Amino acid sequence: RLQADTFERLVLGQMHETVGPQEDDDPIEFYIQVLADKTGSLIAAATQAGVIFSGAPSAFEEPLRVYGEKVGVAFQLLDDVIDLSSKPEDTGKVPGTDLRAGVPTMPSLLLGVETDPVSVALAAEIDEGVQRIAAGEDPSILDDALARLRDHDVTRKTLDLARSWTQGAIDELDVLPKGPVREALTRFAQSLADRSS
């Protein structure tokens, strides 16, 4: 049943990502749900299976499922920050790869709800650049705009949001007795949060 539920969430998450939010959907909440359905559900299944196969008390199953889902969301939010701030020589990726391909990220979604003229202009510049790249122009046309997005407050907000999801995951571990398992799961969540440093 666990595998079937996880597969269903993965498929729904991918379908929702492909189709995109509907007119009455909040794009930010929608994006978080996609992250939870995709990466979150995979890590949640692993932590839930750990409880089941280890013979641990069933009372640990739901908190550890939630822990895994929150870790997955935090991981993807941090990926959005890393996608903008990474150095090609460190990662082998050009910064902003996702956005250049037209894939929304949390910084771009947060930028889209900003109302100050500088943010509105930057969002429009990125949207136009994505359309031009899709039409065949060189992806480097977005280099300057993505550097400004990297330095924009919305990227820091995304990092703060990721850290909040990480802390939420760690808080779910309060049901576990103190010991090596709880410590290892705490370190795992913290190590994911530290990837952005």
Q: Whereabouts are the PLM-identified features?
A:
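All-alpha prenyltransferase/terpene-synthase fold signal
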Residues: 1-197
